[in-house]
């Protein structure tokens, strides 16, 4: 890899680490181009992304940004999934892992100031996403309004 290519890759990695709040670092073995294509496509629909990284350059970027505690996780064939919604990308990766048993293994996740283990990532995958929570709240509100109105009208009728 030429020095100019390394500098470009380094700036891309630094840009990802500074732009996005959440990262999941995963190891991949035996993934073919179609696997990456389908995973990237799903992530893109969720306003997220995936980047295969060069370990040594990632360590340099992390050191520059003061996140050296993550450097130990960069060994082997690594990719980073980045987003502003960790639950959504956790769900996508968990689904991909379920469909493709031995192709990826989660190493850790990074949440602004904290390193999260792979079990925590899988726990996040079991939680409802922000959009699903909004839908649940709206359905509870829209269900309760007519019931409360009926109870109020009934109470008024009983009062008179």
UniProtKB/Swiss-Prot annotation:
CDD domains per UniProt: Ribosomal_L10
GO molecular function, one term: large ribosomal subunit rRNA binding
GO biological process: translation
Gene Ontology CC entries for this record: ribonucleoprotein complex; ribosome
Keyword terms: Ribonucleoprotein, Ribosomal protein, RNA-binding, rRNA-binding
Role noted for this protein: Forms part of the ribosomal stalk, playing a central role in the interaction of the ribosome with GTP-bound translation factors.
Family: Belongs to the universal ribosomal protein uL10 family.
Quaternary structure note: Part of the ribosomal stalk of the 50S ribosomal subunit. The N-terminus interacts with L11 and the large rRNA to form the base of the stalk. The C-terminus forms an elongated spine to which L12 dimers bind in a sequential fashion forming a multimeric L10(L12)X complex.
Entries under PANTHER family matching the protein: 39S RIBOSOMAL PROTEIN L10, MITOCHONDRIAL (PTHR11560)
Name the record gives this protein: Large ribosomal subunit protein uL10
Gene that this sequence comes from: rplJ
